Amino acid sequence: MPSTFFNLTMAFSLSLLGTLMFRSHLMSTLLCLEGMVLSLFIMTSVTSLNSNSMSSMPIPITILVFAACEAAVGLALLVKVSNTYGTDYVQNLNLLQC
């Protein structure tokens, strides 16, 4: 069991590192954020299955719902930005402009 948590913690850490390092493209940032959320989902699923408590079962489902919403909003933002600017470079975006 500790190796599972170690692997999930490493997956979360590598996704966080990828988010911090590869900030030039919006697509790579969104993929790293999705990796962070999915590793968090798996970690809470394993924890809730090991605790044998019915009160902790809805937490992974809630995280999965938020991950689906995050993916949908991220894809909509990516399509809008790539259609408007022709690229997905984050440094070219100025979200304060109208």
Curated annotation (Swiss-Prot):
Report any one BP term from Gene Ontology.
aerobic respiration
Q: Which InterPro entries match?
A: NADH_UbQ_OxRdtase_chain4L/K, NUOK/Mnh_C1-like
Give the membrane topology.
Multi-pass membrane protein
Q: Which reaction does it catalyse?
A: a ubiquinone + NADH + 5 H(+)(in) = a ubiquinol + NAD(+) + 4 H(+)(out)
List the transmembrane segments.
2-22, 26-46, 58-79
First-listed, main subcellular location of the protein, grouped into a coarse class: mitochondrion
Q: What class of enzyme is it?
A: translocase
Q: Which GO terms describe its cellular component?
A: mitochondrial inner membrane; mitochondrion; respiratory chain complex I
User: Which subcellular locations apply to this protein?
Assistant: Mitochondrion inner membrane
GO molecular function per UniProt: NADH dehydrogenase (ubiquinone) activity
Q: Known EC number(s)? A: 7.1.1.2
UniProt KW keywords: Electron transport, Membrane, Mitochondrion, Mitochondrion inner membrane, NAD, Respiratory chain, Translocase, Transmembrane, Transmembrane helix, Transport, Ubiquinone
* Family, per entry: Belongs to the complex I subunit 4L family.
- What does it do? Core subunit of the mitochondrial membrane respiratory chain NADH dehydrogenase (Complex I) which catalyzes electron transfer from NADH through the respiratory chain, using ubiquinone as an electron acceptor. Part of the enzyme membrane arm which is embedded in the lipid bilayer and involved in proton translocation.
The UniProt subunit note reads as follows:
Core subunit of respiratory chain NADH dehydrogenase (Complex I) which is composed of 45 different subunits.
Q: What is this protein called?
A: NADH-ubiquinone oxidoreductase chain 4L
Gene name in the database record: Mtnd4l
